[in-house]
């Protein structure tokens, strides 16, 4: 009996066997990503794909400063409003910045024909040559070119007029018919602007042009229009009851434009030979110009980012990330981050059987932890880690390269009468934006799911690699660990890690230890059976003695009568 109890104690005592475990890296990262199946999954490493910051400034693009119109509008700048005189010398720019409430536009009130289309044309222009299309002194010898000024276009307290137009008036009591032409020899498109004056009454018409009925004719290969002044009293705007309507056309190289009139012509003085440049544009912004360089400019500020997406502003100029409405686009590159032994939630542990990551393993994503008589330690599996890093890096770079189409996205111009078209355009743009946002988010969700599954598979493969080497020389004890049936020193452990484990070398020792352990189990079972029998017999005797004592007590006090019949 003593021998059996000794065997039992030996079986119950813990064995100090050598072990090796397969595990994965964990750290103190708080990065979270979303997948198709889960939200806010904490991971060890991730990359952000969404730029959400800007510097709040207007910066140079490719070393070229923008054209800041200040208090002037596009109309004020291109017509030459006297209050915009500082802009006359500007010849090149990376983009044009206009404030939302620019004060100086058309100083003399009137209608600017096809203004939105002109803005659209200028948005693709990066420089121009301003030149005299009809020199002031020599082109109009029979007309007055100095008295055409107005208080509405005053400059430094004096009446003035646009710097790029001439208001031709009567000279010496007459306004002879005029005919003037220009041939475009610039080898570029030339922007030509002019106007037609509409007086408020017939007296002004006669005073300025010496005739009641007048006309203005403008003709080129692609433009042909005849204007008749509309004389009528109108509400005062900028203290003017008259109006000037403004017109423009683009003259192709080699084309000719002809002006004919017998009154009311606001003649071209300066024209512009346009140079178009990819990436230019017009933005409306209150931001100030700063001494900074950027690759991408938005109305909010400049963006310096190589990320494929941004949520700063849909209007961009330069090499810009694609705008999406997302608030988070983060792609996982590492593993699920579970630093301690805890559940991974609905989907269990990583690789299906390992409950927690190792913060002690810092030199790789997957690896080993061993324990033997010589000590314990962590070691990364460099080959599987490097293969995973290469694969994921290539995938992330591929995603960024495919989605990182840098481009300019400027707003489209519509006038007040085209409100329905503008609303329709917004709906179309919103639809495209929703599609882009959905595609970006779905791409990230799918790739995150694939990456985490990829890591799970790598851990599982590493486990199976060890299992296939050890075979029955060790037993699986759960949580990714194996317990050796033989002594495994550091050299032995290293052979398991590098795939050179010598199974036959340790198989005999393992077999003997397995048989000993199996024998201990059988002896333990015999002891447990003996103890069970003794326990049953002892319990029965105690029960019988108790019943006898109770019966004797009851018979002695008369509570129980006992009769024996023969």
UniProtKB/Swiss-Prot annotation:
Localization per Swiss-Prot or TrEMBL: Virion membrane; Host apical cell membrane
Parts of the chain that traverse the membrane: 530-550
One Pfam family it belongs to: Hemagglutinin
Signal peptide positions (record): 1-17
Membrane topology: Single-pass type I membrane protein
Record's keyword terms, sorted: Clathrin- and caveolin-independent endocytosis of virus by host, Clathrin-mediated endocytosis of virus by host, Disulfide bond, Fusion of virus membrane with host endosomal membrane, Fusion of virus membrane with host membrane, Glycoprotein, Hemagglutinin, Host cell membrane, Host membrane, Host-virus interaction, Lipoprotein, Membrane, Palmitate, Signal, Transmembrane, Transmembrane helix, Viral attachment to host cell, Viral envelope protein, Viral penetration into host cytoplasm, Virion, Virus endocytosis by host, Virus entry into host cell
Lipid-carrying residues in chain (S-palmitoyl cysteine): 555, 562, 565
Transmembrane helix listed as a keyword: yes
Modification comment: Palmitoylated. In natural infection, inactive HA is matured into HA1 and HA2 outside the cell by one or more trypsin-like, arginine-specific endoprotease secreted by the bronchial epithelial cells. One identified protease that may be involved in this process is secreted in lungs by club cells.
GO cellular component, one term: membrane
UniProt key word Glycoprotein: yes
Disulfide bond sites: 21-481, 59-292, 72-84, 107-153, 296-320, 488-492
Site keyed Cleavage: positions: 344-345
UniProt superkingdom: Viruses
Note, other: Major glycoprotein, comprises over 80% of the envelope proteins present in virus particle. The extent of infection into host organism is determined by HA. Influenza viruses bud from the apical surface of polarized epithelial cells (e.g. bronchial epithelial cells) into lumen of lungs and are therefore usually pneumotropic. The reason is that HA is cleaved by tryptase clara which is restricted to lungs. However, HAs of H5 and H7 pantropic avian viruses subtypes can be cleaved by furin and subtilisin-type enzymes, allowing the virus to grow in other organs than lungs.
Annotated function: Binds to sialic acid-containing receptors on the cell surface, bringing about the attachment of the virus particle to the cell. This attachment induces virion internalization either through clathrin-dependent endocytosis or through clathrin- and caveolin-independent pathway. Plays a major role in the determination of host range restriction and virulence. Class I viral fusion protein. Responsible for penetration of the virus into the cell cytoplasm by mediating the fusion of the membrane of the endocytosed virus particle with the endosomal membrane.
Subunit structure and binding partners: Homotrimer of disulfide-linked HA1-HA2. Interacts with human CACNA1C.
Full protein name: Hemagglutinin
Organism of origin: Influenza A virus (strain A/India/6263/1980 H1N1)
Upper lineage: Viruses, Riboviria, Orthornavirae, Negarnaviricota, Polyploviricotina
Gene that encodes the chain: HA
């Amino acid at each position: 009996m003593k021998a059996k109890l000794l065997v039992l104690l030996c079986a119950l005592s813990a064995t100090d066997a050598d072990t090796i475990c397969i595990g994965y890296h964990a750290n103190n990262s708080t990065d979270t990503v979303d997948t198709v199946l889960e939200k806010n999954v904490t991971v060890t490493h991730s990359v952000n794909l969404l730029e959400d910051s800007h510097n709040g400034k207007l910066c140079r693009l490719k070393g070229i400063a923008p054209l800041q119109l200040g208090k002037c509008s596009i109309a004020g700048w291109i017509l030459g409003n006297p209050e915009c005189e500082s802009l006359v010398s500007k010849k090149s720019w990376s983009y044009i910045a206009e404030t939302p409430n620019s004060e100086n536009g058309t100083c003399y009130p009137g209608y600017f024909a096809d203004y939105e289309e002109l803005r659209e044309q200028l948005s693709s222009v990066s420089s121009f040559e301003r030149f005299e299309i009809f020199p002031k002194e020599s082109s109009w010898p029979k007309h007055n070119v100095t008295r055409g000024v107005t208080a509405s276009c005053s400059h430094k307290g004096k009446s003035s007029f646009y710097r790029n137009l001439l208001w031709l008036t009567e000279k010496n009591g007459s306004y002879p018919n005029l005919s003037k032409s220009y041939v475009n020899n610039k080898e570029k498109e030339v922007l030509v602007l002019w106007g037609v004056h509409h007086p408020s009454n017939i007296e002004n018409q006669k005073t300025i042009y010496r005739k009641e009925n007048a006309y203005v004719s403008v003709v080129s290969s692609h433009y042909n229009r005849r204007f008749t002044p509309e004389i009528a009293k109108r509400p005062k705007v900028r203290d003017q009851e008259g109006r000037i309507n403004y017109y423009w056309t683009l003259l192709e190289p080699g084309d000719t434009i002809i002006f004919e009139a017998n009154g009311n012509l606001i003649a071209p003085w300066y024209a512009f030979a346009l140079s178009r440049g990819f990436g230019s544009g017009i933005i409306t912004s209150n931001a100030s110009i700063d001494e900074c360089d950027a690759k991408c400019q938005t109305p909010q500020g400049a963006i310096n980012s190589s990320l494929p997406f941004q949520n700063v502003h849909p209007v961009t100029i330069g090499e810009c990330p694609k705008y999406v409405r997302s608030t988070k686009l983060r792609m996982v590159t590492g593993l699920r981050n579970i630093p301690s032994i805890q559940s991974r939630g609905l989907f269990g542990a990583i690789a299906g059987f390992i409950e927690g990551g190792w913060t002690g393993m810092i030199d790789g994503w997957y690896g080993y932890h061993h324990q033997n008589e010589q000590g314990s330690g962590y070691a990364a599996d460099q080959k599987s880690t490097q293969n995973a890093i290469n694969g994921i890096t290539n995938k992330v770079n591929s995603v960024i390269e495919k989605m990182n189409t840098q481009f300019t996205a400027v707003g489209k111009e519509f006038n007040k009468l085209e409100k329905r078209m503008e609303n329709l355009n917004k709906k179309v743009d919103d639809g495209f934006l929703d599609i882009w946002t959905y595609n970006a988010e779905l791409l990230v969700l799918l790739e995150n799911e694939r990456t985490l599954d990829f890591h799970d598979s790598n851990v599982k493969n590493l486990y199976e690699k060890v299992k296939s080497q050890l075979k029955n020389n060790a037993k699986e004890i759960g949580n990714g660990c194996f317990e050796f049936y033989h002594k495994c020193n550091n050299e032995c452990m290293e052979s398991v890690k590098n795939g050179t484990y010598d199974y036959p070398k340790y198989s005999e020792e393992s077999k003997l230890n397995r048989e000993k352990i199996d024998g201990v189990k059988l002896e333990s079972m015999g002891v447990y059976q003996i103890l069970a029998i003794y326990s049953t017999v002892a319990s029965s005797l105690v029960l019988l003695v108790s019943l006898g004592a109770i019966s004797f007590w009851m018979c002695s006090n008369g509570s129980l009568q006992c009769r024996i019949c023969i």
